[in-house]
């Protein structure tokens, strides 16, 4: 879970209780189940602090903009010389491939927007190629009529017509095999196959269907965009 933005760490995880009043925040430090203190505004975290690790020594010396931190956290590298390194999820798909009809790597709910530096954030496949880019939800799972846009064929195209279109495309493919030598054609074929599997897959529809979860579970995660994205992420992992 990559949280884009939050209150100051001085008010959350790194209280600095011994610092002068003009430096430390207005909140008090509280004891936790772990061997460290947290802010009083994180009582829930304090109760389970023995179940997670807190790293306070992570920093970088690159340009003081969000983008550089995003690059290193998501790819392990700072982009230099115009080379865009792949996100860890893209690299994993490149090495391991897909295990099912589901995308191997999904961004919820949408890609990061501009955050000051106007540089890549490290959310795409970079030099591995577009074939390994993540599947982007681009929807809010907390909305009442939540649907995944790319799981739905256009309304005017039913299942039978969709199947006929695929058969016609296969006929054309078989006729013009000489074009398959180009990388662009291979990428198009790969993307088409992945998209077709996705929109015709019961497994994919089921995984993205939050209505399958009991209401009590959904409410426990929080009926917010962030909460329901966490729940959806859990379903995709499972």
Where are these regions (language model features)?
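Ligand-binding pockets and gating/stacking loops
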Residues: 1-238
